[in-house]
Amino acid sequence: MQLTVLENLKKENVEIYLEYLNSCKSSNWETWETTYKTYCNNFKLFLVWFQNSYKNRLLLSKDTLLEMPSIMENYRNYCRSLGNSKRTLMNKTTAISTFYAWCVRRNKIKYHPFSEKLDRLRFTEKDKVKNSYFLTTEQILTVRLYMQVESKKYDLQDRILWELFLDSACRISAIQNLKMEQLDLENGYFKDVKEKEGYIVNAFFFQKCKELIKEWIQYRTENGIDVNWFFVTKYGKIYKQMTQGAIRNRIRKLGMILGIEDLYPHSLRKTAINLINNLAGLGLASSYANHSSSGVTSKHYIAKANPTEI
């Protein structure tokens, strides 16, 4: 997990947070690159804001702990001014709260500074629902063919992301963390893919995706892209792992082909699982989704009588 962003922050705050991360890693190895990666990123955002807003304050100083409820309210307001949803705000608050809970357990502080002291975020039905789209086969083919024709607007990674999300039904965290060494091109899958809750699965892909991956491998060779991450972004002259934000932006761009302004990778996952259910039944769909029970699949991943379908 890269922590270079922390280098310019107050040393004492960084040290205690790194100690916390190391502790988490020892007991949560399976989810270190998924759940705790999100916690880490959320806490880094808070640390940057905290230093900019409160200068040389220490995270565990007496005055900081006393003022923490007000500090958290200020941070909430800051996040809302950036357009963060209530759900995102809750996740960011949780990342900070778990850090302070750990500090209490390790006797670094005597009490949690804002537990049960903040007003609860009130969620309406509008807050709870993010638009989900169950795409049709026609829509899937439309995007595929449009990218093929408009090859200057959409690169190989756009095309592979589209096919791979729909073929594998994997979550964005799993797709983002794919590495070249996991690829079994001949047999059509990435092996040892880490999914939510520590599940280790194979991410399968089919013929069209296989052809695009062959092109991508050739392109990487010709252009000297010698990094292990499968999906990459160029920063200056250096290729690095593509971020989840960049992947979301690419999928959102592809959604615009269909006139959908808020298409997310999770809608592609839902589409894939829904299509499998229609073809082969709920049991196989649930298994392919790596769900612990078919109830989760049925409730959240299968198109109802009147789905949002364009």
Give names to the regions the model predicted.
Residues 195-215, 227-250:
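C-terminal catalytic core of Y-nucleophile DNA break-rejoin enzymes
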Residues 137-172:
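Basic, Lys/Arg- and aromatic-enriched nucleic-acid-binding interface segment
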Residues 168, 172-173, 177-211:
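Conserved tyrosine-mediated DNA breakage-rejoining catalytic core shared by Y-recombinases
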Residues 183-185, 261-262, 279-300:
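Short, polar N-cap/turn motifs at the start of nucleic acid-interacting alpha helices
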Residues 124-142, 197-208, 224-228:
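DNA breakage-rejoining catalytic core of tyrosine-based enzymes
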Residues 163, 167, 269-291:
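C-terminal catalytic core of tyrosine-transesterase DNA break-rejoin enzymes
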Residues 16-130:
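N-terminal core-binding DNA-recognition domain of tyrosine recombinases/integrases
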Residues 194-196, 289-310:
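Catalytic-site neighborhood detector that most strongly recognizes the C-terminal catalytic loop/helix
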